[in-house]
Amino acid sequence: MADKKPTAENWPVVSGDYIVGDPESPVAVTTLASHNEDIPAAAGAAIAGPCKTENLGIEKVVANIISNPNIRFLILCGAEVQGHITGQSFKALYENGCDPEKKKITGATGAIPFVENIPMEGVERFQQQLELVDMIDNEDGGAITAKVKECIEKDPGAFEEDSLVIKIDEERYSKKSSFVESSSESEKIESEA
């Protein structure tokens, strides 16, 4: 069995519309505009749910992934979100990161592709911790189940670094502030984007 690490306390750390499975599973699944999260959850995903926006939605997914070092794969499946183009924005963030000052996702084509509450440390951790699996526009339950199981079989073990917790204050979202805490170092950093 692959080596595992503890998740952040009270994982998932950010609320949302998702199903939580085994926190030691190496797979997270974003069903984009589709609501078939029960399929990947039943197949063994750690967490599965829709993500409809290319800003706060992506921030929530990133925060929940990097706070669980056992997650090593993010499967993007389900219907692409029209206008927001959330799946493509995830791919752009993973492949290109974002502008360190403006926090715009480099190469994203969505309407408002900004990750203003995720510090660069969080973006880099997202890029390093996992492998992105592109099944955008695929809603086939059998194919999604097979891919989740395939990723579980390829589990490389937990990411070498401990949980990285990013707290997103949704009520103050427009103020663009975030707090980062490394679970191994209990230091807090406030960043203004």
Curated annotation (Swiss-Prot):
| UniProt superkingdom | Archaea
Write out the pathway annotation from the protein's UniProt entry. Answer: One-carbon metabolism; methanogenesis from CO(2); methyl-coenzyme M from 5,10-methylene-5,6,7,8-tetrahydromethanopterin: step 2/2
What does the entry's cofactor note say about binding and number? Binds 1 5-hydroxybenzimidazolylcobamide group.
Regions of this protein lying in the Cytoplasmic compartment: 1-38
Task: Please tell me which top-level EC class this enzyme sits in.
Answer: translocase
Assembly, per entry: The complex is composed of 8 subunits; MtrA, MtrB, MtrC, MtrD, MtrE, MtrF, MtrG and MtrH.
- What protein family is recorded? Belongs to the MtrA family.
Q: What is this protein called?
A: Tetrahydromethanopterin S-methyltransferase subunit A 2
Q: Which organism is it from?
A: Methanobrevibacter ruminantium (strain ATCC 35063 / DSM 1093 / JCM 13430 / OCM 146 / M1) (Methanobacterium ruminantium)
